[in-house]
Amino acid sequence: MRRVLFAVLAVVSLFTLPPGRAGLLAAAELQPLEIASKSGVHVFAVEMAVTPEEQAKGLMFRKQLPEGQGMLFDFHREQPTSFWMKNTYVPLDMIFIRADGRILRIAENTVPLSETLVPSGGPVLAVLEVVAGTAKKLGIAAGDRVAHPIFNSR
């Protein structure tokens, strides 16, 4: 049912999003990701950052990020990492995720344009960036499980 809903939303967004809007992701580039928390299952549409170039740029220079969308950074192996908000205009929640899909740590409401490092707090396979306030609003916390093909598939 969630996949059908996601497909319908993706098609609708193709016709409702204005062309050429910086910061909005094309529906064809988005993949579904689910987070199971105590408050329920939350579905996101994520853009993948898998190459070093994609990861270095991340969400830099974008002026907006719609609720329910995000960027998933896949490091291909577990490792400690740090992020920053240089050239990033949208405040974010950074969700650090282990290879088993469990959330290790959440850095909430990161400061736009800050060059202060935001550490993972341990080895992670991926980081999910979403609009600031999302984790608190949805009750997402450390220990919650993330479902996406990159987890437990290696």
PLM features: residue spans?
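Bacterial N-terminal signal peptides
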Residues: 7-21
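Compact, glycine-rich, soluble single-domain proteins
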Residues: 23-154
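Positively charged n-region of N-terminal signal peptides that target proteins for export
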Residues: 1-4
